[in-house]
């Protein structure tokens, strides 16, 4: 697992992180997505689940540890993670 402060745009990651916050949202086109904040001991990073109903996205809540796979991108000058798989980690 890589720490959040080590990530750079273009990185592909796989690891277990704390879901600090989870909030449903809607794009300008009316498509639902999940806006989450991931945290580890080095800091926090914004994350997006653009297709929350896709295979591999399990139901999880804020303050759950989740297994995450995705790509690091930059939007409006800030790093964010586009999450492809998010599974609750027990």
PLM features: residue spans?
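OB-fold nucleic-acid-binding modules
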Residues: 1-13
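Glutamate identity and glutamate-enriched acidic tracts
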Residues: 6-9, 34, 67
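Short, acidic/hydrophobic/Gly-rich beta-strand patch recurrent on exposed beta strands
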Residues: 35-40
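OB-fold single-stranded nucleic acid-binding module
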Residues: 22-32, 43-89
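Non-catalytic, usually N-terminal nucleic-acid engagement modules in DNA/RNA processing proteins
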Residues: 17
